[in-house]
């Protein structure tokens, strides 16, 4: 069934749709999927990200996943960033994008629009415009 899904994804990719493998390292996400599916972005599961500063084995695993993803020409997103230390670790290890409560709690559309229009969010707007391109 994975081959059938991959074929459908390739057709969608040709129409400009891009795919991310979410929660990499847990559940059904696996190494064979990285090779078979036409994904452009790998999202590291927050269960790994949240342990990088407290557990050296988790830190080693995350470093290896980032390195491997870049070797496959994938963009890497670190999910679940909650602390400055986690952010610093991921930035130091060349994680391309970060997301989590460190930046913002989940927002409604109206709350997001209000955040973008509030004072002091120039850096956030600049970051979002870069990420969105």
Q: Which ranges hold each PLM region?
A:
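EAL-family c-di-GMP phosphodiesterase catalytic domain
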Residues: 1-3, 13-133
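Conserved functional hotspot residues or short segments at active or partner-binding sites
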Residues: 8
